């Protein structure tokens, strides 16, 4: 049986990325909550060299 988590940076970014969050009202609320909580990472960001 195939495992449920098949990692892919592309789909990860397209679903949970910053621009996707900012596109909707609720997404902006997510960012706002994470800012208030003091999260280091507000959304998924793929580390690049």
Curated annotation (Swiss-Prot):
GO cellular component: ribonucleoprotein complex; ribosome
Tagged with keyword tRNA-binding: no
Keywords attached to this entry: Ribonucleoprotein, Ribosomal protein
Gene Ontology terms: biological process: translation
Domain of life: Bacteria
Molecular function terms, GO-annotated: structural constituent of ribosome
PROSITE patterns: RIBOSOMAL_L34
HAMAP family per UniProt: Ribosomal_bL34
Protein family (similarity comment): Belongs to the bacterial ribosomal protein bL34 family.
Name of this protein: Large ribosomal subunit protein bL34
Taxonomic classification: Bacteria, Pseudomonadati, Thermodesulfobacteriota, Desulfuromonadia, Geobacterales
């Amino acid at each position: 049986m195939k495992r449920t988590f098949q990692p892919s940076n592309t789909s990860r970014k397209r679903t949970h990325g910053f621009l996707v969050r900012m596109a909707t009202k609720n997404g902006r609320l997510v960012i706002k909550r994470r800012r208030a909580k003091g999260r280091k990472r507000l959304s998924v960001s793929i580390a690049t060299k």
